[in-house]
């Protein structure tokens, strides 16, 4: 097991003091500590996180730490290969990757697929990596950091599920929603009560899809035309928009704030088409709830 505070202290002793990334349930006990630091930036997607880290290095000539789930590694490939690669600008980066679907670990189907190919993907990208499972593996991290700084290339730490110690009680996640807010499951219940029977619902990853399925099953709502986005975070609106190209379908996208932020450009495409059979409902709880509850500063953004 890894003590999250010891990990953070170790990285800072190695002069890694800037952190950015996208929340992950495997890393939540580590990233919950990061959320208390001024030198931490929550990115909208993994490619942006890598790009922020690259910019930090260009400005300060110091190695940044970029965290993500392995399912988001694909989002990061473009800047990793097109900017940070040793054949381009040669930028040292430390990637900390939550390894969902690691071999021998029971997980959801979408994670098993990515988990199986994660090591090979890193090898294909030319990124040296190590699997970190306990505090005494910090020497592996040290070697990776030294190698990255010497060769000026990205390196990665793979961390399996149930590896990082829980944070202490004083650091437990907070509820960022006011007492006047409504619960997500109540929003979903009202949607089910008010849509027509043939309406197709496309629900985003995480608790939204789980609770929609739960409501259908437990509260005896009529079986619907639902598509649950168990993976592909940030793409629910585009999938729903694609479904709406069949004009006979009434389509509702049930999205979350963290998901929508990942690929905001999709809203421009969808909005320009002005389709009458497409509705986009955003459930804004100002946090990445299903992967650790990290706060999203969406309260300052006008969504209307």
Question: Can you describe what each PLM-predicted range is?
Answer:
Residues 3-14, 171-236:
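Active-site diphosphate/adenylate-binding microenvironment
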Residues 7-10, 17-18, 123-172, 304:
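Structural signature of the thiamine diphosphate
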Residues 20-24, 41-51, 67-73, 205, ...:
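Active-site nucleophile and cofactor-binding loops and adjacent substrate-binding regions
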Residues 24-26, 100-101, 159-165, 205-209, ...:
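Glycine-rich beta-alpha junction loops
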Residues 25, 39, 83, 90-98, ...:
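Thiamine diphosphate
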Residues 28-43:
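Short acidic, glycine/proline-enriched helix-loop-strand junctions
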Residues 63-65, 92-94, 152-156, 198-200, ...:
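Residue-level preference for the first positions of well-ordered beta-strands
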């Amino acid at each position: 097991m890894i003590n999250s505070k010891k990990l953070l202290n170790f990285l800072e002793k190695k002069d890694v003091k800037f952190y950015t990334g996208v929340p992950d349930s495997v890393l939540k006990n580590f990233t919950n500590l990061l959320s208390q630091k001024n030198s931490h930036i929550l990115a909208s997607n993994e490619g942006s996180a890598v790009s922020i880290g690259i910019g930090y290095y260009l400005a300060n000539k110091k190695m940044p730490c970029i965290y993500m789930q392995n399912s988001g590694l694909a989002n990061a490939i473009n800047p990793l290969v097109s900017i940070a690669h040793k054949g381009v600008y040669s930028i040292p980066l430390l990637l900390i990757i939550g390894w969902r679907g690691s071999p021998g670990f029971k997980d959801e189907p979408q994670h098993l697929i990515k988990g199986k190919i994660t090591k090979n993907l890193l090898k294909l990208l030319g990124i040296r990596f190590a699997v970190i499972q306990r505090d005494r593996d910090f020497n592996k991290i040290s070697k990776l950091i030294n190698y990255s700084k010497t060769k000026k290339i990205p390196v990665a730490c793979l961390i399996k599920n149930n590896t990082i110690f829980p944070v202490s009680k004083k650091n437990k996640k907070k509820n960022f929603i006011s007492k006047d807010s409504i619960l997500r499951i109540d929003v979903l219940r009202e949607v089910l009560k008010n849509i027509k029977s043939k309406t197709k619902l496309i629900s985003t990853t995480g608790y939204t899809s789980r609770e929609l399925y739960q409501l259908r099953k437990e509260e005896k709502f009529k079986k619907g035309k639902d598509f649950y986005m168990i993976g592909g975070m940030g793409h629910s609106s585009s999938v729903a928009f694609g479904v709406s190209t069949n004009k006979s379908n009434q389509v509702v996208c049930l999205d979350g704030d963290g998901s929508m932020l990942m690929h905001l450009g999709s809203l421009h495409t969808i909005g320009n088409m002005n389709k009458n059979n497409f509705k986009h409902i955003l459930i804004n709880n100002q946090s990445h709830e299903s992967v650790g509850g990290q706060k999203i500063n969406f309260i300052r953004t006008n969504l209307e």
